[in-house]
Each structure stands twice: as C-alpha cells, then as structure tokens.
C-alpha cells in the first residue's frame, strides 16, 4: 500500500484547535424535574423560589418556648401539644406555655427558641420543668436563614452532582433548565474489524487475522463513564470503502451533534477519511495535531455547526485524543463551566525524563504512593500499538509542546486507577 502525498498530515498546534473548539455553539436547552438532573448541565441559574425555611423551625428535638419565659430557671411551663416535621402547627404559645417539637418541625406561633429535651423534665401532669435558659433563636433555624427568594443556588454552566439534588429540593427548586445531552454517533472504519459477539470468537478472530473492534467501544464506554451530559446514540462498523464511510458519517450527522470516526486517518491507499471529509465540504477542517500519540487526529466543523472528529484506530492514540480533544468538544457544546473534579495528583519522576521539544505528549505511567508522596515508578513502552500496556498503568501524564520534565521534578498525573500504596502492608 503506497502512501498518497496529498494525504500527508500537516501538523497544527493544539492552541489552534482549542480556538476552534471554544467557538462551537452550545446545544439547546430543556426544562426537567430536579430529581432527573443528575449529570446534566444547567443552562440557566437555579433560583430559589421561596424563603427557606418559610417559617421558623426547630434545629433540635426539644421544647419550643418563648425565651422570655425561661430567663430564670428552673421554670415550670404548661405543655400544650407537639409538632412533628411534615406538618404546619395550628397552635400558638401563650405566657409560660411550651410545645414539644422534632428536628425540622415548624415552631408554634410566638415561639422563638427551642430547649433541647435533655434539659427538660416532664412532670406527667401536663407540665414540664425547663432547667436551662435560652436566648432568642437558640436552636432555631429562622425563616429565610438558609436562602431568600431570588437567591441563586447553582450557577448556569454547572454540572449537577448527586449531592446537589437533595439541596436543590430542600430549597424548593422542583425543576431546572439544562442543556440537552450532546448526541454522539461513532463510525468505526476498517475491513479487518469484527464485532465482539461471543467470548469464544475473540481468540479465533485474532488467529484468523481479523481485529476485534475495541476503539469505538472504548469511546462509548469512556463517554458513558466520565461524561454524563453526553450520550452515544449509535455506533457502526463499516469497511474500507469511501462510499460506505461517507454514508455512515452522513447518517451520523443527521442523528447527532458530533460524529466520531476511528481508523482510516493515514495516507495509504486504503485510508479514506481524508476523501470523505473533503466531500463533506466542512466550514473548518484541521487535520493533524502536534501531539503524540494521535498525530493524525482531525476535527471538522460543518455549515450546520455539526462536528466530525477523526481519530486513529489505535486505542492508545484515541485515549489521548479523548482526554485532550473530544472531552473539550463535548464540554463546550454542553456549556460546561463548572464540572466534576478529575482525579489528579502531583507525582515525582524518579528516573529519566518526559516531554518533547516539538510535540505535545501523553505518557502512560504507573504511580505508587510512598508515605505522603506520589512516585512515578514505571513507564512502560510508549508505542501506540501496544494496547496491552493499558493494563500495566494507572495514570496519564500530559506535557505541552516544548515542556520537559526531568528526573527529580514533579508533574501532574491524571489517575485512571487508585495508586498502589507501598506503605500499606496489606498491599504487599
């Protein structure tokens, strides 16, 4: 297979690509119930609709009192009833009267404090003795003390996390405006590819010279695991045929916001992605990035603002493009400004060096924890075809073009798994 010179890749700086990415339009918005918003991106501020709490409420189990009645203790009060959380009291306290309240219950009218029950003696004749004085608003959550109507609870662009939902509901926010999920369609190209269907077929396919499709599946699994505000709406395998590839890509464009292709990005006579992209007449097309692995990566923006991303067929090259390019495209189109944190640590390089004068690089590394320090213990062979090395690592190091990390220096590591703890004897 001869390479075609017109297909040779001209490398572009990542900064150029990021400018294109950050100019992409965001997807439409929709209103959904708050309890369905986990992992979604707010398209508008989540605004508190009422004062919270709307009435004074008890912060402890105990006895609601008028603080003026227990200035001097012990004080004998008449017990007129009780209030539990989930109801609105229809009683009011008169002089020297009290009511039992549970945590979170609204206070009877005229009550301005709660005496915790351990400081109260029940006499059994409808009276109690209070043995601790309280000041106004002691052990009480006053009306509006959590939030006022019109307060912003979460800002637009925030990814809603599981723990945000109960807090939003407590503030009375029953629905929120979010970006719809970014839709993604994946096209795996290659006449050598076969779909994994039966476990016993995998080894037989390899022996017969076929390649079990795994790169597109990795993309789908990565999105499902790490990008909750996106969804893969389809995935297909097509042979090395330009018409078949173009039909699959056009189908993806009609059903998704982003089409991701794998394979066919090289300059050989059976690599057709370049021809397909030219036929689409993109408004913007960058092919070839100054990064390794993943130099043949391409990104195109069409006239209808749909995006097509071309990735290598090698999982390792695609993993780099996923974490550096694809994730940023999806974040931009989803309108993400505040997303979930990534598991990153600063680790010490104890031997060798990392980095490249001409290319941005991603390295697969093994990180261990020794005491309070993270150490890059092992760097396996870095070839993009060595997919099995993904089982030997637990982190990725990204170095920008021209950035060199020398022995003894620290570098940021994106963790893929928990680091091995050398100080924990249970791991030995």
Residue ranges, per PLM feature:
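Short, glycine/charged-enriched hinge/interface segments at domain edges or termini
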Residues: 2-8, 12, 24, 63-234, ...
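Helix-rich terminal scaffold detector
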Residues: 2-11, 174-311, 315-325, 428
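Residue-level signal for inorganic ion chemistry
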Residues: 21, 62, 150, 186, ...
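A charged, well-structured terminal subsegment
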Residues: 322-343
